[in-house]
Structures are given as structure tokens and as C-alpha cells.
Amino acid sequence: MDKKVIIIIVITLFFVLKKIRKIIGPLLLVLVFLFLFNNIKNIKSFFQTPKNEESTYSFLTLKNSDINTKENLKNKKIGYIESFMPVEIDEYVLKSYDANNIYNVLLKKEVDAIYISDSYLSVLKEEYKDILEQTKIVEEEKVENVILATESKNRDIINIFISGTDSKKEKITSKSRSDVNIILTVNTKKNKVLITSIPRDYYVELFSNKKDKLTHCGVYGITVCTETLNKLLDIEINYFLKINMNAFTKVIDLLNGITLKDGTKLTSEEALKYVRERYSYKEGDRKRVENNQDILEEIIKSFIRNKSLLLNYKDILESLNGYYMTNIDENLIVEVIKNLLLGKSLKIERQILNGFDSYDTTYSIPNKKLYVMLPDDKSLETAREKLKNMLP
């Protein structure tokens, strides 16, 4: 049967024969599964997207060093950031350092070179404006980091970490700052969704009890982000979805724009400005986080209202290729699509973690006090309680 014919039949059943849904229920179920079965290859295309992060690691030496090739590094002393040595390098003398010392030990010539990722080099550029003039890259290596999904202890509850990068140029597989941080908690049994947003500047505990902004977690990888949020919220994140600005604007274009609760219609570029702007608001990033939730909720509702979007998901996924990465299980996607096609209602709730404005040093940029948001214990406890209430 032609795909378009199936789409017409299913939409007709939904919108013309609503009053006799009980009678056609079994037939509708068959048609839904027919559609999913006939298009299972299209679903699988979603899961052929990147699931692993890639990093470029560089051997960095001082500009006036006589080390110019990787061969020159043999038997030399190499510094690396503690807990972040992605490969075994036997031919070098290795020594680990905290992130706050890694560049200083090179400047003081305590090591001959340092081994760091491109994502952390971008952070160092903020603190040391002349780092590229003072150093040179001897060798670069591509390293792939596997990101495993965590099986839920309760199959009815799924926690998905959504990470949004503030870039259109970076490869989606590159480690980068996480400017949008959302936990999407889905109760598949009750058809409930809880959107939990955490501000980018939230002052959180990373590995080894080090404090940093949440946005900097992304520099060290998605796994560090999820582990940090698991600890903060006392939850278990099962999957991740990482998107960039291209993915965002393309989804809005596919929806022919987005309409806010107050009736304001936004184009994709206007919506992008709406979710990025924070300096013009008195509430700053708090307002930006709220705007992010507005758009995400409307996107979810748009898919629920317009079943044809679900039926044409192949085109949607193909148009987003290269702009997102995920390790979401295909069975979960099939379950969600099936429930929405069968007309099951979805209750959406939302919450935003709050805190207090402050300035403090961070693990990533230790020699300079940056703006951070100190967690409000009451807000944190309320958020944890809401997440627990999502359990069956």
C-alpha cells in the first residue's frame, strides 16, 4: 500500500470518525502498526545518527620549543588533565594535573608539552588571550568517546538529558559547552511529561568534588553532564539528545513557525532569538530558561495536535541529519509514536531550578571569578520531589 494512502486513511480515522473511536479502535491499532512496520527502516535512520562524541586532542608545546614532531616527544614529560587521558601513551613520561594548573606548568617549563582536548583549549582561550601566540600544536589526534545508555530500573519512567549547544558551525559530535540543559522525564504509563530546566550558570559539583558552571560540563563530555545532574537531582538519566541551533531552526520551519501562549507567532529565526536572548531581560538567564521551556512545550503540543507530522517523521529526521546526536532506544520512540497516533492525551508539567547570583572561581577557569548561580536548597528539594512524584 502506498505511504500516502496510509497517511490519508489514518488521518481520516482520527479527525472524521472520532465519535465512533471505540468501534474502530482495533482497526486503528492495526493500521498504526502497519504504518510503523512498513516504515521501520525510517525509524532506524534515527538511530543511525552519531551516538558517540569525538574530540581532537593536541600535544601543545611552547612556541620556542625545539619539539616540532610527535617523534620529538618520546621520553619527554607530558602533562595532562587528571581523569582525562583518553588513550594509553607508553612512550611518554606522563604526569597528571588539575585543570587549573595544566597551562601554568607548561609556561613554567615543568613539562615539555601538555595533552589537551580542543574543547578545553577553547576554555583556556578565555583566560589566556595570547595562548595561541605563546604555544604551538605539535600533533593532533582524533579520539572517540562511547556514550552508553543506562537501562531504567523502572521501565515506565525515562529521563532524557537534552543538551543544546550555542553553535551552528561546530560538529554535533564535538565536545562543547552545554548552554541549554533540560531533563525530560517521561512516564509512559501515565502519559505524563515533566520538563526540568537547569540554568547554564548553575554552580554544580563535577567529578572529584570540583565546582564549576553547568555549561562547562559539556566541555568534558555528555557523560560528565549526566553524572553531574544525576548527583544534583538524585535521579538516573537514561538517554541523551544533543542538538545545535540548526536543528532548532529546522524543526520550527517544519512546523511553519511556532505560536506562543499569548498568540505571538514566531518564525524560526525569531524563535531562535527568543530562546537565546537574556541580556535584555531584568531576570537575565532565568527568563531565557523560561522561554526555552515555552518553545519546547509548544513543539511537543504541535506534534500532538498535528498527527501528520508524526506520520511524516522520516522527512523530519532526514532534514535534521548532522544536527543532532542521541542514544535513545528505538523501542521508546516506537512506543511514543504509537501512543500519540492512538490519540492518548499527554500531560505536560514544567519546573525551573532557581538560585542566587554570585561570583566565584570555577574548575575550568580557576584564576578568575565568573558569574555563577548558587543553588537554592529549597528550589532543589522541590525539584527532586517533583521528579520522584513522576514515579508510578
Regions found by a protein language model. Give the residues of each.
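Membrane-embedded alpha-helical segments of integral membrane proteins
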Residues: M1-K18
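Hydrophobic alpha-helical transmembrane segments in integral membrane proteins
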Residues: L36-T49
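Hydrophobic membrane-insertion alpha-helices, especially the h-region
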Residues: I24-F37
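Non-catalytic, solvent-exposed segments at the cell envelope interface
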Residues: F47-N52, L60-N64, K70, K74-P392
